[in-house]
């Protein structure tokens, strides 16, 4: 293709049977709701809509026992949490093999260690040909591709993580940045999706800028660079746990998801741990909706006290307030849809509470 790569990241459809308006923003051309005429459209089901988990308001907690200790009297467990002023949010799930309540303490302890071990580094200083703006353009476009392909939220978060981890270890040419982005989404799709898009779908969405062979070669390179390890915890994993601990409703949970997704586009947040971003997003959502408190139960399960996340909350508030003037509108447009409760359009996102937190920075 003679197209200048990245300066015009494009997925312009050239097939005559595809219809839909073309929208260009900051060099990115994207169709609005024009279906792909490949196998992807048939394979993706309604179950892949980004609906997230069903929120429960039951009281549960990561058990402090190994499996051999499950038979400890329930009253003893309740007493231990009463002393800590922490609700046992897992009590009702004990004995349910599909929920693994007996193992949750160890699972989240391991996830906290893992997010630190696999954390991407601050890599932009050693990149000669790319910069913050190019990364933001790429991520903003990938968010639109994720919506277009109807991929899971986990796939999107893992895609951005793979990009940042790869860039932490490799210098990338400007002309290959979009290639790296679609290859990361291909890898993430194979890892997360029941039916992953085909390589041809990514060739198509990039307007044939890269061949199938180029994508395969980049896939091999990225897999080796990342040592075939994509087991890092995602913000979503921690948010779901926190939402359960806070017994939050769908509006607060969706607002926290929106705030978290805004951070994907901003390079400033790549050195923040997923657990911290999840805690800060839920904290801000609680304050914006009804000024709910950050309870001892939330502090216990998130691993963060109110004081420990206020700095990140402030940065997140500044980012949210900047959205009206931002060139990168993919997340805001995505969450203006009815299936996301039009959460990006609520008046609280322009109110004095958000401004108050932003001023603390």
Curated annotation (Swiss-Prot):
Pfam families in the cross-refs: Cyclin_C (PF02984), Cyclin_N (PF00134)
- The signal peptide, as residue positions, is none
Q: Which UniProt keywords apply?
A: Cell cycle, Cell division, Cyclin, Mitosis
Q: Which CDD domains match?
A: CYCLIN_CCNB1-like_rpt1 (cd20507), CYCLIN_CCNB1-like_rpt2 (cd20509)
Domain of life, source organism = Eukaryota
Give the InterPro entries listed for this entry: Cyclin, Cyclin-like_dom, Cyclin-like_sf, Cyclin_C-dom, Cyclin_N, Cyclins_cyclin-box
For this entry, list what GO says about its biological process. Answer: cell division
To which protein family does this belong?
A: Belongs to the cyclin family. Cyclin AB subfamily.
Q: What job does the chain carry out?
A: Essential for the control of the cell cycle at the G2/M (mitosis) transition. Interacts with the CDC2 protein kinase to form MPF. G2/M cyclins accumulate steadily during G2 and are abruptly destroyed at mitosis.
In its UniProt entry, what is this protein called? G2/mitotic-specific cyclin-B
- Species this chain originates from: Hydra vulgaris
